[in-house]
């Protein structure tokens, strides 16, 4: 979606695709909204993401607002296996989303969150790869030095995932019943992120792989 490099006004990822091993990250566009709205009818997802149920029109407004907000950086997660099939639309490939929320006062700190909304896409490593890809992107392109994640205490899967990525609890909110976890992007962490995502390729949006079986005219 949109995200400026330290308030410079340039929407860094507005036309960026990040192609990984299992997933592809694309900017959150208007055409993605109906499927996203379907996902957010789930009481489970609403609880896990601390979100309120919105109407479809409100969801369109939210997408437009986020696209214009330079302190928010959002990618839709696509299932790469589906994405490689020419007959599949981008909407058919949608699996979830991954987000960065930059701190207005400290632009080198970002809250990060991930959601794998499609049940068939869970437990496939999508969330881990999306987080690593986003964290490396944020560190390299946005100058992020610290990541924060806010996770409900009942969301054991997310807590486990973030722990495995090196995040540690720094505080607990009784009001929201959630943990705040943090990870400092040290030189060692940045090297680890670069190595963990060295398979990721960057394309300009929109992009789909060419069908290599078709003739080139």
Residue spans of the language-model regions?
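GNAT-family acyltransferases
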Residues: 2-121, 141, 168-217
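Conserved active-site alpha-helix within GNAT-family acetyltransferase domains
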Residues: 128-129, 142, 153-171
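Active-site acidic-Proline motif in GNAT/NAT acetyltransferases
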Residues: 118-124, 153-154
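Conserved GNAT acetyl-CoA-binding A-motif
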Residues: 109, 138-152
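Conserved acetyl-CoA pyrophosphate-binding loop and the N-cap/start of the following alpha-helix
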Residues: 121, 125-134
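Conserved alpha-helical elements of the SDR catalytic core
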Residues: 134, 138, 165-166
């Amino acid at each position: 979606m949109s995200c400026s490099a330290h308030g410079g006004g340039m929407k860094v990822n507005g036309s960026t695709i990040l192609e990984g091993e299992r997933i592809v990250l694309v900017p959150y566009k208007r055409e993605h909204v109906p499927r996203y709205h379907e996902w957010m009818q789930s009481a489970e997802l609403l609880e896990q993401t601390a979100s309120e149920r919105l109407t479809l029109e409100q969801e369109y407004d939210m997408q437009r607002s986020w696209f214009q907000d330079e302190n928010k950086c959002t990618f839709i997660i696509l299932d790469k296996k589906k994405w490689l099939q020419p007959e599949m639309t981008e909407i058919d490939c949608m699996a979830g989303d991954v987000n960065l929320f930059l701190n207005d006062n400290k632009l080198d700190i970002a809250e990060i969150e991930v959601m794998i909304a499609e049940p068939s896409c869970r437990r496939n490593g999508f969330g881990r790869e999306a987080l690593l890809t986003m964290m490396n992107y944020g560190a390299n392109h946005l100058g992020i030095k610290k990541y924060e994640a806010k996770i409900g205490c009942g969301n054991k899967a997310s807590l486990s995932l973030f722990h495995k990525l090196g995040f540690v609890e720094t505080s607990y909110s009784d009001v929201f019943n959630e943990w705040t976890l943090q990870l400092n992007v040290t030189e060692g962490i940045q090297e680890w992120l670069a190595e963990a995502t060295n398979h990721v390729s960057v394309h300009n949006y929109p992009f789909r792989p060419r069908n290599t079986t078709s003739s080139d005219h």
